[in-house]
Amino acid sequence: MAYIIGHKEFYGRLFQVTTATLIPRPESETMIELLKELVQLTPPRLLASPRLRLIDVGTGSGCLGITAKLELPELDVTLADISRHALAIATKNSQRLHADTTVLQSDLLINYPFEADFILANLPYVDRSWDTPPELEHEPALALYADDDGLHLIKKIIQQANTGLTPGGHLLLEADTSQLDAISHFALAHGFIETARRGFIICLKRRET
């Protein structure tokens, strides 16, 4: 239905969607709630320095990164996606909602020139062997499916975030609940500790030493 009417509500705001983007889901709003808590807990010494940087990787419609910017204006937000078609929609949503964001075409963090304080990532995590609801057939396969039991891109961004995040920075990922233990174990071996898990969201903190 969202593709027919051309928009979907997320965190109280309407976002344009097309077949180049995933449809925003209520479950993803938990990531915003967790982010707000993390920013609130950020030591004052960091808040006094240049703006905290956030990158929304695999941004799609931009719903996560744009919402983060509107809820937390102090953040410097970049919307990144490998798909230029998705980025065109993210740009439109950002402009329409008056969110001051930067748009970047990038394969995960490859083209991002900074260390981020926060990374949000709702990457493809569906394995093609899973039974999936019929409505997913209309959503872009590039944004849905991944190899390695659905964890290929999630593992890749954990590896990249080991240098792409500031020490003590946070990586927030969305995945199926059945995958969260495997993600946590993989992250532990790559310099991260799990600090929170809520529904489909897992929060990983880069070790400071």
What residue ranges belong to the model's regions?
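Conserved AdoMet
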Residues: 1-38
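Conserved beta-strand termini and adjacent loop/short-helix elements that scaffold enzyme active sites
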Residues: 18, 104-106, 197
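Short alpha-helical
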Residues: 23, 84-85, 127, 152, ...
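Short glycine/threonine-rich catalytic loop with a Thr-x-Gly-x-Asp
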Residues: 24, 60, 150
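Conserved SAM/SAH cofactor-binding pocket of Class I
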Residues: 30-132
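Generic C-terminal helix-cap and adjacent flexible tail
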Residues: 41-42, 206-209
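Mobile active-site "lid"/loop adjacent to the S-adenosyl-L-methionine
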Residues: 123-153
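Conserved Class I SAM-dependent methyltransferase catalytic core
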Residues: 149-206
